[in-house]
Amino acid sequence: MKKHLIVAGVPRAGKSTLCAQIARNFPYQHISMDSVIAGFERCFPDTGVSTYQGLSSMDTLKVISHKMAPFLQAMIDSGEYDEQDYGMLIDMYQLLPEDYVNQIDPERCAILYLVTGNVTPEERFLIQKQYDTPKDYTYYKTDEELKEGAQYIVEQSRLIREQCERHGLPCFETAFDRGQVLEGILQKLSM
């Protein structure tokens, strides 16, 4: 296993659930990049790392991904984990495969993606409702907002899957049999 691992993909695909399981079973420290990005938005708005840029959801994803990839590489390069028995387990939505390939050292940091693109937006909306909890920011959104979000999550899932295929990166569909898919990933990591 690599010193560091990124679990990336769309919201409610199982990233945080998988990261919690990985952190319990392997020598990794779970880092949620949602919190880091929220910090950038609030304290350093001049960086352009913001989910509220007035852009389409797809364009916002691309902008944040392109800006966060070198930040992640700087975290890896810092050497803070080199002397530890554990590495970083980075849980992240806004990192496209093309930015991982172009800006992050794969010798030191592996990646896998979780998506929900083999569904219609309506099916994706129902998945969101199934897995939302009061701890999730989406839990408090209206059904209308969630249905709009489901459309872009399906589109982003398909973009991520296409880029993963192009670059030979692991991508897992979690729209159906999510628990089994996540368990299969854990088994692969154990080998």
Language model region names:
Residues A20, R24-K67:
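Conserved substrate/cofactor phosphate-moiety recognition/catalytic segment
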Residues V7:
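Hydrophobic anchor at the beta1->P-loop junction of P-loop NTPases
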Residues D59-R108, L112-T116:
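Glycine-rich phosphate-binding loop used to anchor ATP phosphates in small-molecule kinases
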Residues G14:
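Conserved glycine(s) of the Walker
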Residues P11:
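The conserved Walker
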Residues T17:
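Conserved Walker
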Residues A110-Q156:
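A glycine- and Lys/Arg-enriched "phosphate-lid" helix/loop adjacent to the NTP-binding pocket
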Residues E155-M191:
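NTP-dependent small-molecule kinase module
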